[in-house]
Amino acid sequence: MSFGGLKALSNVNLDLNANEVVGLIGPNGAGKTTLFNALSGLVDVESGSLSINGKSHKWPKPHQLVGLGISRTLQGVGLFPELTVLENVMVGDNKNARSGLISSALGLSGKDEAKLKQRAMTALERVYASGIADQRSDSLPYPVTKRVAIARALVSEPKILLLDEPAGGLGAQDIEWMNSIIRNLASQCSIILVEHHMDVVMSVCDRLYVLNFGEVIASGEVETVRQDPAVVAAYLGVNN
């Protein structure tokens, strides 16, 4: 996988099964965020291939993700402070517009608006946040904004959900909430996550890909990867 003529990732083959949670882990600078950004359409990929349900696709731009059944959250959360929680979630259903997200999602009327609101409420229920639908997002504590951001990603009913550091900045109790949310979401979609909290990774992931220096050095089920000497060496800074 190349960017700007430079090879950023080498020999990375990632596969994802239905209703599976796959974690991308590795030390700082390993390449996991680069891979996540490529999947999220945040960088221009010059080489490499993408296949969904056996069909090849060009590497997507952000506005093309929903059309491929992909949705994502990012570390920065990015809620609109002037909107209510429900309105923020409705904005996540952006199938056509490249810009004007708010006007395209909130300018609906009649049946279309009712259907979108219902999907948004369902998404909030899945992250245990339906009770705050009418609150302004700028009134929320940080852990709750993380859940609302996930709900916004769910409103388009994705088949693949990309989560960037879902437990980042959370305390122990909120991490338990997040673990529960992710496990429940996997019953309806497949999930790829980047996460530094290893207790989260061990709790929710079915399989792991461990990256170091832009390459996958280990992959497989959690316990198998956990005991791999190459993984231990990477995290301890030991050269094999």
Q: What function would you assign to each model-found segment?
A:
Residues M1-N240:
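Glycine-rich phosphate-binding loops of nucleotide-dependent enzymes
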